[in-house]
Structures are given as structure tokens and as C-alpha cells.
């Protein structure tokens, strides 16, 4: 039987690549053959926590990363907790990674003694395909000389921007960027947000309620997937048409028309609406979703039926409807629910001609819900499958 020591170094490095970096490094004490094998690994990850262990790890990286033997670093990740990673160390290691043609770089700073700006060489790295930056101590300070010709995936979550122009400048020089994710915080130094990326195919935005309400400009003509989670009570969007859009995932407190009127081309829509006490529970007339085939609608309000009937009327080719009602107490005291029994003269076209799959989750058997189900089953002529899921814990006035 062959011994593991008889295997080639190339195969042993392949085996080590399936281990976390810490475990892979620990094999260096097995024998002379194993001593430096880990230094050929192309994927490295280092986690810092408080205490002497982090100091040892810093010394280890400072000594060994400059001597790393892999000609290309496929993936490099640094994650720091409790101020254990020093800014000057991180800058030095990123420079080394750039010199080794790093393809994916992930930096997560949950807490450090000072904000860390990344070296200017990172912003002209020709090999970089994926960049992920997390944490309020990461400072995005983009130099005037910036060009990332290979960058396709960019994630910017809860970090700081040196000024209003940093994000716009960075995006302007990523000619093949396809996937962009931005999670904002109130401390990030941005007021407006401008995303003008002709090549972008996926865009995800998360905006907490305490962020600024200045204008958001989105120009992404190649976009196929759009996700926005916006908890602000006031919002302003300027969105150019997205003719290639296939899917949208929207979570808003109110005013869904601010987004819906600009993204009507999708085939699949998932939307969660949480209305407040001052909002009418519909969007404006004139918005039609001719391409919409799959709708997942979650309404966190007792006044759910008015929005639902409008979606049904404005989606003439709808094939799949997933409805989740997770209501709070009715926010509109004079709200008049849809009278499903008396709504015979204007049956939505999708019920008569296209709806095939229907699911209702959160059902508790109110008179309005029973009338709605009777309406669906009476008029949905093409229906092939349906399911009604109860949710006992759902709030309904108790």
C-alpha cells in the first residue's frame, strides 16, 4: 500500500487546498517534505482576534507572505476582530498580494484602532476579479489613478467613503463589472448614491432607515437582477430603464411606485411592503408588468387586498402567484377592503388566461381571506396547482 509520503508534492498541495489555512500550515511540522508545502497554496485566509495569538499570527504573516511560492494568489482573506490587525500591516500585505496577481481579495474589519485605507496599488491591480470589503474601519479612499480591468464582483458593506466622489470614481473605472453589492450605514459619508455601470448584470442595495434621503441615480442598461432593501421613510430614485431585467427583489417601507415605475421589464418579482400609518396601500395607476410571470408578494399590513388586486390587474401574463400576508394592525382606520364577491365585472386577465400556480401563506381564515380564495378558485381557469398554508402565530388583533 502506497504511503502518503510517496505522493508528489503537487498532489499533496492539492490535498492541503481542501483544509483551512491554519490547519494546512500546521502540517509543516510533520516532516521535512511537508515543511514548506503550504507555501504553494493559492488560497489563504487569516482570522485575527484579540490577544497574543493575533500577535503571533501577524509575525507569521509578515515573515512568510513575502516568501510565498504560489505564482498567483487565487484568493486572500483577512478578517479582524477587536482591533487586533494594524493598518500598516494590512497595507503591506495587500501590496504583496497585488504583486502576486491576486484574483480575489476579501477584507473584513469588525474593529480596529484606526480606519484603514488600502494601498493605491490595489486600485490598478490588473488581475483582481473579486473585491469584498466589510466594516466601518475600512476607508474607501480611491486615488485619481484607478483602473481595474478584470474586476467582475464588488461587495462594499458597512464601510466608510473618503468623500462623495469615491464610489463614483471607482465604478467609473471597472469596465467589466458584473456584480455589485452595497450595504450602507449612516456613518459612511455618502449622501447621494450614483451607480452608472453599463456592464453591470446584478445589483444589490441595502439602505437602513437612518441613511440620507438624497437622490439615488442608477444607470445599468445590462442589469438582469436587481435587489433593493430600503427602510427609509422618504426616498428618491432616478432609474433609467432596464430592458434586460429578469428578476427584481424589493423590500420597502412605503411608496413602491418609486421603484416599480422604473423596473417594469422583469419576469420574476419578489416584493415585501411594510406600510406605515400615512401611506395608501397601492402604487399609482398606469404601471403595467407585461413580462411578469412569477410574483412573490409579502404584505406586512392588515390592508393587504388593495395592493394585491392592483398587482393582479396590472400583470396580464402572470403564471405563478405566491402570497404571504403577515399583517400588523390595520394602519388605515377607514380602510375599505376589496369586495371580492362584488368584483365580477373586472376579473384580472391573468386569472382568466394564464395563472397556473397559486400559494397563499399566512392564512388564518378571516372573511376577507375566504372571499378572496373563493374568487381565485372561481375565476382562475388555467390553475394547475394550489396550496394554502396557515400560520397560527400570525398577528390579527390579539
UniProtKB/Swiss-Prot annotation:
Q: Which residues form the signal peptide?
A: none
Q: What is this protein called?
A: Putative FBD-associated F-box protein At5g56700
SMART domains the record matches: FBOX
Q: Which organism is it from?
A: Arabidopsis thaliana (Mouse-ear cress)
- The F-box domain covers 1-47
- Tell me where in this chain the FBD domain is found: 340-388
**Matching Gene3D superfamilies:** 1.20.1280.50, Ribonuclease Inhibitor
Alphabetized PANTHER family for the sequence: F-BOX/RNI SUPERFAMILY PROTEIN-RELATED, FBD DOMAIN-CONTAINING PROTEIN
Q: Which InterPro entries match?
A: F-box-like_dom_sf, F-box_AtFBL13-like, F-box_dom, FBD, FBL13/AtMIF1-like, LRR_dom_sf, LRR_FXL15/At3g58940/PEG3-like
Amino acid at each position: 500500500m502506497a504511503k502518503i509520503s510517496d505522493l508528489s508534492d503537487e498532489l499533496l498541495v492539492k490535498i492541503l487546498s481542501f483544509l483551512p489555512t491554519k490547519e494546512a500550515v500546521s502540517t509543516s511540522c510533520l516532516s521535512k517534505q511537508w515543511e514548506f508545502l503550504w507555501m504553494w497554496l493559492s488560497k489563504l485566509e487569516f482570522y485575527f482576534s484579540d490577544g497574543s495569538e493575533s500577535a503571533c499570527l501577524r509575525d507569521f504573516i509578515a515573515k512568510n507572505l513575502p516568501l510565498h511560492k504560489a505564482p498567483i494568489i487565487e484568493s486572500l482573506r483577512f478578517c479582524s476582530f477587536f482591533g487586533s490587525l494594524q493598518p500598516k500591516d494590512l497595507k503591506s500585505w495587500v501590496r504583496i498580494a497585488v504583486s502576486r496577481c491576486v484574483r480575489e481579495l476579501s477584507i473584513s474589519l469588525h474593529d480596529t484602532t484606526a480606519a484603514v485605507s488600502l494601498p493605491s496599488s490595489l486600485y490598478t491591480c490588473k488581475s483582481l476579479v473579486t473585491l469584498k470589503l466589510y466594516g466601518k474601519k475600512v476607508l474607501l479612499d480611491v486615488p485619481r489613478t484607478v483602473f481595474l480591468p478584470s474586476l467582475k464582483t464588488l461587495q462594499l458593506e458597512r464601510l466608510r467613503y473618503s468623500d462623495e466622489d469615491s464610489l463614483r470614481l471607482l465604478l467609473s473605472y471597472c469596465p467589466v463589472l458584473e456584480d455589485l453589492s452595497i450595504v450602507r450605514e449612516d456613518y459612511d459619508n455618502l449622501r447621494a448614491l450614483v451607480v452608472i455601470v453599463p456592464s453591470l448584470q446584478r445589483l444589490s442595495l441595502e439602505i437602513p432607515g437612518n441613511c440620507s434621503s438624497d437622490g439615488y441615480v442608477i444607470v445599468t442598461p445590462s442589469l438582469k437582477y436587481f435587489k433593493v432593501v430600503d427602510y427609509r421613510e422618504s426616498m428618491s430614485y432616478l432609474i433609467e430603464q432596464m430592458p434586460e431585467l429578469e428578476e427584481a427583489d424589493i423590500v420597502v417601507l412605503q411608496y413602491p411606485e418609486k421603484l416599480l415605475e422604473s423596473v417594469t421589464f422583469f419576469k420574476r418579482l419578489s416584493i415585501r411592503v411594510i406600510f406605515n400609518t400615512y401611506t395608501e396601500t397601492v402604487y399609482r395607476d398606469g404601471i403595467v408588468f407585461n413580462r411578469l410571470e412569477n410574483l412573490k408578494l409579502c404584505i406586512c399590513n392588515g390592508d393587504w387586498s388593495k395592493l394585491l388586486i392592483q398587482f393582479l390587474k396590472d400583470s396580464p401574463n402572470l403564471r405563478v402567484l405566491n402570497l404571504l400576508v403577515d399583517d400588523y394592525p390595520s394602519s388605515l382606520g377607514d380602510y375599505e377592503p376589496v369586495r371580492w364577491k362584488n368584483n365580477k365585472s373586472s376579473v384580472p386577465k391573468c386569472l382568466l388566461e394564464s395563472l397556473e400556480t397559486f400559494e397563499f401563506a399566512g392564512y388564518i381564515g378571516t372573511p376577507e381571506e375566504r372571499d378572496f380564495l373563493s374568487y381565485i378558485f372561481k375565476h382562475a381557469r388555467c390553475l394547475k396547482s394550489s396550496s394554502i398554508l396557515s400560520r397560527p402565530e400570525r398577528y390579527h388583533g390579539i
